[in-house]
């Protein structure tokens, strides 16, 4: 583990906190989604994600992706942020999974690579899979970026999601941040005590020790997080300062979400 690795790891943890702060900042913007009741956002975006998964036509899924981009612009979400954090990652991950479909799906061959043929049906299948993932992840990211996490949990609880699920989601969110903070402090401490460049054998020993200590701390941290939440009165019901009341605009937006989702499912059959 060389100094450059320690520095890059510490910078990576810093970027994780920066992205978290970006989500909180975006949620405070005055935009389309931010102006809606959190319950409407959860139900509406979930309806659009469901429509994406049920649609079987590339044109319909592509149209939903355009809708997602328009919603992002109207909600003051950076397109560069979406491209960097969502689209490129989803494209790389899904592309690896969809690549074999180009060759193994039976259909009319349009090109040949030796004894393997690329089929038209295979290209359509791969394109549909990639578009579905890109669009669904975009809608989900918009929900996370435009809604504080506590509001998401309260909206899910208002929609009768079991308390056990709310507790798991709340604990996971807090646990991940505390674990990242602990790991960041460990690497920062190690970097401040490292002089010069370690040999490969020393790098491996240090990496193993750091991973072992972090694992042991993670077990203790999980208990501490749960006990801290319990001591502060958390029982699965999320409390926020704002009082939610559905307005006429919320009902219109909810109707628009459901209508768009239903129309997409009907057109994508």
Predicted regions and their residues:
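Structural signal for the C-terminal ends of transmembrane alpha-helices
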Residues: 72-78, 146-148, 266-267
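Short helix-capping/hinge motifs at transmembrane helix termini and TM-loop junctions
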Residues: 56, 75-76, 104-105, 268-269
């Amino acid at each position: 583990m060389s100094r450059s690795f320690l520095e890059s790891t510490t910078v990576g943890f810093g970027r994780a906190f920066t992205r978290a702060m970006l989500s909180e900042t975006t949620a405070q913007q005055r935009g389309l989604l931010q102006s809606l009741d959190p319950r409407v956002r959860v139900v509406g975006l979930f309806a659009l994600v469901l429509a994406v998964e049920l649609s079987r036509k590339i044109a319909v899924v592509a149209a939903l992706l355009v809708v997602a981009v328009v919603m992002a612009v109207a909600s003051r979400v950076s397109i560069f942020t979406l491209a960097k954090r969502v689209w490129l990652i989803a494209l790389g991950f899904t592309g690896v999974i969809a690549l074999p479909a180009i060759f193994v799906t039976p259909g009319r061959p349009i090109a040949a690579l030796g004894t393997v043929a690329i089929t038209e049906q295979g290209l359509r299948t791969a394109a549909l899979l990639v578009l579905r993932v890109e669009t669904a992840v975009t809608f989900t990211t918009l929900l996370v970026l435009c809604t504080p996490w506590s509001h998401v949990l309260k909206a899910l609880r208002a929609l009768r999601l079991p308390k056990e699920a709310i507790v798991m989601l709340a604990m996971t969110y807090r646990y991940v941040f505390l674990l990242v903070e602990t790991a960041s402090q460990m690497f920062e401490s190690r970097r401040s005590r490292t002089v010069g460049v370690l040999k490969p054998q020393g790098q491996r020993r240090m990496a193993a020790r750091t991973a072992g200590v972090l694992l042991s701390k993670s077990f203790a941290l999980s208990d501490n997080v749960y006990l801290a939440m319990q001591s502060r009165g958390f029982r699965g019901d999320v409390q926020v300062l704002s009082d939610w009341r559905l307005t006429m605009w919320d009902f219109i937006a909810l109707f628009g979400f459901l209508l768009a989702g239903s129309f997409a499912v009907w057109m994508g059959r």
